[in-house]
């Protein structure tokens, strides 16, 4: 989303985004009540946010532990052929998130597995491509943080004289 598009979002749009991120199952009538708009007005605003790609989807958040995935881990993957890594990620259902990154590693993958043997099997697939390093996630402190439009404060320009002082 560009800063120009950010400028077009008003306080109602921001509240709509906050409410839907907290509970995407709200009816349009209830959402309208919460943001002080009529149901047709809020429906139109949500439609525009979807059309602009700001709202990119709705999903259920599941508890991976309750689904049988007792271990979550991060796999850092070194340099390897991009297409081969992408293909392997797509073929690995245990891969919850995959990030192509800068720095020492080229990829950071988040995986969910049943146990240590399952972890070893998944990591071994990526070891065939390149070197890896694995960290088991002990505790999740923050996840699925709701985000609102970026609001960077304007930076004050300092004169060269004030910098030298």
What are these regions (language model features)?
Residues 1-165:
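A compositional/biophysical signature of low hydrophobicity enriched in polar/charged and small residues
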